[in-house]
């Protein structure tokens, strides 16, 4: 399994808009991609820093997404991202979770 990690900063006062856009627009795009296994997004309360990870069954499928839909996703986030996101693809070496629950979104 492979992980695409994207880290970026949000523009001021866009936390709620980011959450809406991610849930309404981006998750459906990811879900339609071949080999997509899941997504986890991290943010520190009160911070502009966000780390979004997507899980892929193979490097090939992660790369296909990168060439096919990633730029469209960046366009969807253009109103909330400040600067250029940093992207890295890595292999999952170990995982202990099967299911996780997410925290309720907190207004920034």
Predicted stretch roles:
Residues 3-8, 38-66:
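Short, well-ordered beta-strand segments in beta-rich or mixed alpha/beta enzyme
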């Amino acid at each position: 399994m492979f992980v695409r990690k994207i880290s970026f900063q949000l523009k001021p006062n866009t936390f709620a808009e980011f959450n809406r856009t991610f849930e309404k627009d981006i998750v459906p795009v990811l879900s339609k991609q071949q080999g997509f296994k899941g997504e986890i997004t991290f943010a520190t309360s009160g911070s502009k820093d966000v780390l979004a990870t997507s899980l892929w069954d193979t490097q090939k499928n992660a790369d296909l997404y990168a060439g096919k839909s990633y730029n469209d996703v960046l366009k969807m986030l253009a109103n909330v991202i400040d600067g250029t996101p940093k992207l890295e693809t890595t292999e999952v070496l170990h995982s202990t979770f099967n299911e996780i629950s997410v925290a309720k979104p907190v207004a920034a």
